[in-house]
UniProtKB/Swiss-Prot annotation:
Functional note: Tubulin is the major constituent of microtubules. The gamma chain is found at microtubule organizing centers (MTOC) such as the spindle poles or the centrosome, suggesting that it is involved in the minus-end nucleation of microtubule assembly.
Presence of the UniProt keyword Nucleotide-binding in the record: yes
Name of the protein in its database record: Tubulin gamma chain
GO (cellular component) term, any one: spindle
Protein source organism: Eremothecium gossypii (strain ATCC 10895 / CBS 109.51 / FGSC 9923 / NRRL Y-1056) (Yeast)
Length: 470
């Protein structure tokens, strides 16, 4: 039985992305915006979807998300509640009574988390009490603002400390290169350290890549964050498809992430998606029908990535593809063979990829919903460009001492700026680790130092196994 997953959405970005995610899940499971089943007449039909992973269900066929919503100002959560009246458990919604926000400052959000930590953890404990086979968390947030970064960081630390045997995954949005938040490099470097230290798997997005992709795939040329957030929701839905529409493989978060994370430090994943069928993104441009062969190869195109990539020849450590639609297994086999010739894998990594054939929702059909679509999570050394940009932007303003006064009242900075320097050092360590992972003897060196992988003491998975390929 697939375990339950609790979603925690923090700050404006986290709650706006969460709104799109829950809308997508509701459509895929035939649930209305008020939580009522849209198909009560099908009560005698055995459902093939597992709503229990993300929803509680009462005796009146009403569904409530396993979700907690946090923010320090009311607008984003208010919008969620207006769009989904009565959908969320009101006891799982927290808006700061002061409603002042975090002023785009990491330390304000982090200190608020320290102040309210007992109350926050009590909310989480109660939600866990309503599960029967709790599997883990997914945190949705931005790394650049004040609440998503600061409060999100505090919650990450608390979750990994209290529930260290459970999976803690994140969907983390990085900012555009051009931003009006002057302390963005500080917020990002402090948050990235917590993603390194306290997350088991982090799926990264950046707004520049998202905006470019949105402009390409939508008919409407006026892109908005609601549209880019729907792209993120499409990835989140696809990652969990095999949990919610269970298959005999990849039906848990550990089974997915253990294929992607070779060592604890290297747990950052770059998502790609193509094509966007109308059951994922309403208003997507028309496109020709593609085979699974075409889709798998197109997922490697950097224009379909949701993280900006600075190289055309990335080195891959591990790859997981989730396909939906009318897939021919012969096309999958041909694509796997082609990637072995075309894609550069780390020397110690088998030149294969994991492919999961998921199922489309019977409740969310559209004109092209039987078309093949694909989502890829890639663990690749090209992800270091995100970290290098973070470090570079931090160095520029930190060396000038610019805007440090915004952090001087933070509890962590009462005795100086060591936390900034330590965070930079931790991030540089991961950059070095990814670069080292391109070498043939990398895994031998790691195994000599530490045999632990995702989930604690799990052994390295043999990803060459035919049973693991399709």
């Amino acid at each position: 039985m697939t375990g339950e997953i609790i979603s925690i959405q923090v700050g404006q970005c986290g709650n706006q992305v969460g709104k799109q995610f829950w809308g997508q899940l509701a459509r895929e499971h035939g649930i209305g915006v008020d939580g009522q089943s849209l198909h009560p007449e099908d009560a005698n039909v055995v459902r093939e979807d597992d709503t229990n992973v993300f929803f509680r269900q009462n005796d009146h066929n009403r569904f409530t998300p396993r979700a907690l919503l946090y923010d320090l100002e009311p607008s984003a959560i208010g919008d969620v509640q207006n769009c989904f009246p009565g959908f969320f458990n009101e006891r799982n919604v927290w808006i700061s009574k002061e409603e002042l926000g975090a002023g785009n400052t990491w330390s304000i959000g982090y200190d608020y988390g320290l102040e309210k930590q007992d109350e926050f953890m009590n909310m989480i404990d109660k939600e866990i009490d309503a599960t029967g086979n709790f599997e883990g968390f997914q945190l949705i947030h931005s790394v650049a603002g004040g609440t998503g970064s600061g409060l999100g960081s505090n919650l990450l630390e608390a979750l990994s400390d209290r529930y260290h045997k459970k999976i803690v995954s994140t969907y983390s949005v990085f900012p555009s290169r051009e931003s009006e938040v002057v302390v963005q490099p500080y917020n990002t470097i402090l948050t990235l350290r917590r993603l390194i230290d306290n997350s088991d798997a982090s799926v990264l997005f950046d707004n520049d890549a998202l905006l470019n992709l949105t402009a390409r795939v939508l008919r409407d040329s006026n892109t908005s964050y609601q549209q880019t957030n729907q792209l993120i929701a499409s990835v989140m839905s696809s990652v969990t498809n095999s949990l919610r529409f269970p298959s005999y493989m990849y039906n848990s978060l550990p089974s997915i992430f253990s294929t992607l994370v070779p060592t604890p430090e290297l747990h950052f994943l770059a998502p790609s998606f193509t094509p966007f069928t109308s059951d994922f993104v309403p208003g997507a441009k028309d496109f020709k029908r593609l085979s699974a062969y075409d889709v798998i190869l197109d997922l490697f195109d950097k224009n379909n990535s949701m993280v900006t990539r600075d190289t055309d020849t990335p080195v891959y450590l591990a790859i997981y593809d989730a396909l939906q639609g009318a897939v021919e297994q012969s096309d999958v086999t041909r694509a796997i063979l082609k990637t072995q010739q075309r894609i550069k894998f780390a020397p110690w990594s088998p030149t294969s990829l994991h492919v999961n054939l998921g199922r489309k929702s019977p409740y969310n059909s559209s004109a092209n919903s039987d078309y093949v679509s694909g989502m890829m999570l890639a663990n690749t050394s090209s992800i270091v460009s995100v970290f290098q940009k973070t470090v570079s932007s931090f160095d520029v303003i930190f060396k000038r001492g610019a805007f440090l006064h915004k952090f001087q009242n933070g509890k962590m900075f009462q005795h100086g700026w060591d936390e900034f320097l330590e965070s930079r050092e931790v991030i540089q360590g991961v950059i070095d680790e990814y670069i080292a992972a391109e070498q043939e003897n990398y895994l031998d060196d790691v195994l000599e130092e530490d045999g632990n992988f995702v989930g604690g003491d799990a052994e390295m998975i043999d990803i060459e196994s035919n049973d693991d390929i399709i």
